[in-house]
């Protein structure tokens, strides 16, 4: 089958590479000429484990192509929309890119084809997409059959290829037997028990519901962790005890310094707006967002607590991890950004800080763009040891393996101080305190 992917971000690039690997001929289209030129040179715009190799393999196998021309749509049996849907200032999903590619689909189809939304879009958006396509065909004075489908993605950054190749489920919202047949053909490598065929609006809402449920679990466990800090309980054991209930399970019950990324924050905002437009307050979802926004300031508050337990001034801070999660370079809505801004603002007057040393094994270049390089206090470190040397305090923001597996005895020798703020609860409190560290974690 000949397939086009509109957009070459996380979703588009992973989807295109994986579909090509399944035997389809895939053309990835993006209006960013520089990005397409780089992709044709083998330079990817994102970091995702295994993706560079998968792209190279399928480009060499003449199954995967990159272009900035929409003309290839004329040949395609199916066209996936994988463009961004960022949040507007008021919280609504910005759908301008979705409608723009829908128009291009309407301008270029020459035979019956299926327009498939991979992008996360609010309920009812696919109906609007259909109208945009119909309008383009009307202006062309052409009557060409087409179908619209909602096929939301459920890819986790850091394990996106595995998620695509071995999905928990494949959600497909469609209205015609033809669309059903095309989607079944695209995903013919998967067993029938992976599929849930439903109506379009239901498919759209499943995606928002899933992300909101996961975000709610994280905010819930973080609230419990904060209570543990107050009453002297252990959030690790609390989460374990809760997760042992088969009705609940253990996933997404790791307390920390807040969630971020390209999905949860914007999808929460969009779902709240969808509820408001339909006369619903969405109180639980609002509380999830508020709790997470507050949680991102906890590292600065923990630093304040820790500063009261040490006898030395805190001059140099090592911030370990900037990406919103490990195994990605994504800095969108990352807790590290909030923490570093808290340090620079220093409302509690913990400073003056002389150096804020920042380390991330993958996302450092993106961190420089997001956080900036103009403040002379900020020192970006390519090596973990360089960030730790002479630090009065270490603050762990992202649970990279490089950080989790660090030799704490070596850390003790390299540091000037002995205070560790653990925003992801990666260390064993007893062991770390036996080594002479003062340890501040989240509910633990």
What are these regions (language model features)?
Residues 1-444:
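Structural/interface elements that position substrates and couple domains in central-metabolism enzymes
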